[in-house]
Each structure stands twice: as C-alpha cells, then as structure tokens.
Amino acid sequence: MARILDNDVMGNEEFSDRTLRPQYLHEYIGQDKVKEQFAIFIEAAKRRDESLDHVLLFGPPGLGKTTMAFVIANELGVNLKQTSGPAVEKAGDLVAILNELEPGDILFIDEIHRMPMSVEEVLYSAMEDFYIDIMIGAGDTSRSIHLDLPPFTLIGATTRAGMLSNPLRARFGITGHMEYYQEKDLTEIVERTATIFEIKIDHEAARKLACRSRGTPRIANRLLKRVRDYAQIIGDGIITAQITDRALTMLDVDREGLDYIDQKILRTMIEMYQGGPVGLGTLSVNIAEERNTVEEMYEPYLIQKGFLMRTRTGRVATQKAYRHLGYPYQNT
C-alpha cells in the first residue's frame, strides 16, 4: 500500500514539483532565515562578478532543497546541471560532468552523502582550486593529466549531513539548514497550489490540511490532491473544512499529521516494549520496514513533534505519544 505521506517525488502526476516550483527568492514561501542569508550571499557574489561559494543544503526530505538550488541558479542568472550521488558511480562519471561546466555554472548533486569515496575525492581539488588530476592508462604507461576547470558553484543536498566526510563538508562555504515549515507558511503554500490548479478551497480547510502535512510542502501538495478527489466525488468539488476532516480521516491521517505507519511505530513500542527503549533494528523488523526508511523518513517528524526520543539504549515513546494514542502512561 502506498503511503499517502510518502516524501518520494511524484513523477508524472499533475502536481509535479517542477510545475509548482517558485523561480526566485521572493516567490519562495517559508525558510525565511535561509532566504535572508542567501539573498545577501548571492547579491555579494554578483557585485564582485564571482561564482557563489559552494553551498550545502541539508534537512529532512520534501522541504525544498532542490527547489532552493534552482532558485539560486535563477537569482544568479546561470545554468544548473543536476545529478545525484547514487548516479555518479565512478570518478570518470564526475570528471565528464565537471568537464562540461561553463564559467559560473552550478552543479547540483542531490543525495550527495551517497557518493562513493573514490568519486568524492575528485571533488576536493575541483571545489578548492578548480582543477582535477586524472590518471589515464595502466601500469607503466599510466600518466596524470591536469585539467583546469572554470569557476563554478557546487550545491550539495542531503538528508544526512552527518554522513558527509569532514574533508568534503569543510569545502562548503555556505550551509543552509532547511527546517520543517510553520503552519502559516504551509497554509499559504496550499492556497498557492490551489490557485495554480484552480481548486476551490476555503482558508480554514487550507489551514487544517497544513496542520496535518508534517511540516512538509511536498506532503501538503499531495494531500491537497487527495482531498480534491474526495471533494469532487463526495461533495460538490469545493474543499471545505468539513470535507478536509472527512477526507483525511479516510486516509488515516490524524490531527497531528501521523499516518498509519507512524501510529504503528508508536503502538508497537508501547504494546510490545512498554514504550521502550527498543533498538532501531528490532523496531524495523516488527513493523516490516527497512531500518534506513524508519530512521530517515519516519523518526525525524516523530522526534520533532515530541512523540519519540532517541537514547543511547534505544528509541522511547514519550508521554505525549501515550496520550495521543489513548494509552495510560506509567512512568517507569
């Protein structure tokens, strides 16, 4: 069963990220601190006629890291070439990409923490001094070739900044921590999306939808699509607060934005392990999910909302989790 709160990109669905993506900083809703900083750094680079320093964007999935990379490129008026860590399997793959860059271009690497170390090491001299040395041939006939690169900006995006090596992380002069969105910003995003796609929704409905979107624009837009379907078939096509409540209840998305998998995690901890501590591996087996999936997709929001704690001995369900799910709490 597909997870309605899944953060995966929506592919060819109507509400594509590309269609909804703002083009410039003034169009970008939320992330005010990051926007304020980037506006200064971008303007300074333009006045000096220099490439922007390398940028690392990090935070949970679905918070607009890719969108921010495109916005930076538009603000600078430069081209952006896009790839991802898993797609760059060999050093030669990265060399080919770097060799195509024009002065001032942006190279955007999504999931940069998943690059192989052999590939990552090629970036060190490229980022610091704009050159690469590559070996061609084998054995006694091998030789090193020095390639100068034009000044460029590398933008790396990651959900796991802690997995970056120290040498790579140190070469990013600018960092942007993308945080979960506030309710008012998500409400504005929902209303903007509704306007773009000519969906009739009242303000209270947009606010309710925003409250249950896990602080994540991608999820808010996906839920809007599902609620629109519900309103079209069950109602008169207009999304009201009542329609929103009924649709999200049908989708098992509760008032805190937790879906059936989030609730399954917490119920498993409470019912089987007295609230914990329980190890991540054990918990993952019990709910039939991959360990990395639990750690990267589910835990951050549960922790941020105060339902879950990470301790040295394992995961622990909080008193708030007990209260939210209707379990009596015993402080052991």
Curated annotation (Swiss-Prot):
Has 3 domains, the large (RuvB-L) and small ATPase (RuvB-S) domains and the C-terminal head (RuvB-H) domain. The head domain binds DNA, while the ATPase domains jointly bind ATP, ADP or are empty depending on the state of the subunit in the translocation cycle. During a single DNA translocation step the structure of each domain remains the same, but their relative positions change. Residues 182-252 are annotated as: Small ATPAse domain (RuvB-S). The RuvA-RuvB-RuvC complex processes Holliday junction (HJ) DNA during genetic recombination and DNA repair, while the RuvA-RuvB complex plays an important role in the rescue of blocked DNA replication forks via replication fork reversal (RFR). RuvA specifically binds to HJ cruciform DNA, conferring on it an open structure. The RuvB hexamer acts as an ATP-dependent pump, pulling dsDNA into and through the RuvAB complex. RuvB forms 2 homohexamers on either side of HJ DNA bound by 1 or 2 RuvA tetramers; 4 subunits per hexamer contact DNA at a time. Gene3D superfamilies: 1.10.8.60, P-loop containing nucleotide triphosphate hydrolases, Winged helix-like DNA-binding domain superfamily/Winged helix DNA-binding domain. The lineage of its organism: Bacteria, Bacillati, Bacillota, Bacilli, Lactobacillales. Residues 1-181 are annotated as: Large ATPase domain (RuvB-L). It is found in: Cytoplasm. Homohexamer. Forms an RuvA(8)-RuvB(12)-Holliday junction (HJ) complex. HJ DNA is sandwiched between 2 RuvA tetramers; dsDNA enters through RuvA and exits via RuvB. An RuvB hexamer assembles on each DNA strand where it exits the tetramer. Each RuvB hexamer is contacted by two RuvA subunits (via domain III) on 2 adjacent RuvB subunits; this complex drives branch migration. In the full resolvosome a probable DNA-RuvA(4)-RuvB(12)-RuvC(2) complex forms which resolves the HJ. HAMAP family: DNA_HJ_migration_RuvB (MF_00016). This is Holliday junction branch migration complex subunit RuvB. SMART domains: AAA. Keywords: ATP-binding, Cytoplasm, DNA damage, DNA recombination, DNA repair, DNA-binding, Hydrolase, Nucleotide-binding. It comes from Streptococcus pyogenes serotype M3 (strain ATCC BAA-595 / MGAS315). GO terms for biological process: DNA recombination; DNA repair. Its EC number is 3.6.4.-. It comes from the Bacteria. Belongs to the RuvB family. One of its GO terms (molecular function) is four-way junction DNA binding. DNA binds at residues 291, 310, 312, 315. InterPro entries: AAA+_ATPase, AAA_lid_4, DNA_helicase_Holl-junc_RuvB, P-loop_NTPase, RuvB-like_N, RuvB_C, WH-like_DNA-bd_sf, WH_DNA-bd_sf. Coiled coil: none annotated. SUPFAM superfamilies: P-loop containing nucleoside triphosphate hydrolases (SSF52540), Winged helix' DNA-binding domain (SSF46785). Its main location: cytoplasm. Residues 255-332 are annotated as: Head domain (RuvB-H). Mg(2+) binds at residue 66. ATP binds at residues 20-21, 62, 65-67, 128-130, 171, 181, 218. PANTHER family: HOLLIDAY JUNCTION BRANCH MIGRATION COMPLEX SUBUNIT RUVB, PTHR42848. GO terms for cellular component: cytoplasm; Holliday junction resolvase complex.
